[in-house]
Amino acid sequence: MSKEIIAKAQERMNQSHQSLAREFSHIRAGRANASLLDRISVEYYGSPTPLNQLAGITVPEARVLLITPFDKSILKDIERALNASDLGLTPQSDGTVIRLVIPALTEETRKNLAKDVKKVGENSKVAIRNIRRDAMDEAKKAEKAKEITEDELKTLEKDIQKVTDDAIKTIDKMTADKEKELLEV
């Protein structure tokens, strides 16, 4: 019983780490990265379609994203979606491809992005602590139902806390690495 509780908590914490990594990949660090466009949807035949399903996205230079639509007729729709997005980038079209030039980040922008990174990291820690609370509650229920002894409960609580501490350390490291990446010029 105790192994299942820990395994379940660990799995949920790993999912939280993956979610954090995805969030961090969407925060631009002054370099071109195709994952910046993962959240962009384009109206295509009346339904929102992810941009990466409608166009090839390449990184020809460090600060340039090149978007090559599979169907040239949707070029304007892609431009419209990029302009409406919260990326703050202006698409440049030459009729066949769209270029997105990623500007160098100003010091102020870097600091604001670093604050965002801290906030996202903190939210992730809250999620981890909620997972710990759920696991602790589950362990206490198991003890009340006489599925585990009081000694096993104490051991299980220590194990859950250790898994939680490891998960928080991982989040701290991921957050610090992303901040460092943002703040280096």
Swiss-Prot record:
Its main location: cytoplasm. It comes from the Bacteria. InterPro entries: Ribosome_recyc_fac, Ribosome_recyc_fac_dom, RRF_sf. Keywords: Cytoplasm, Protein biosynthesis. The keyword RNA-binding does not apply. One of its GO terms (biological process) is translational termination. SUPFAM superfamilies: Ribosome recycling factor, RRF. It holds the Pfam family RRF. GO terms for molecular function: ribosomal large subunit binding. One of its GO terms (cellular component) is cytoplasm. It is found in: Cytoplasm. HAMAP family: RRF (MF_00040). Belongs to the RRF family. Responsible for the release of ribosomes from messenger RNA at the termination of protein biosynthesis. May increase the efficiency of translation by recycling ribosomes from one round of translation to another. This is Ribosome-recycling factor.
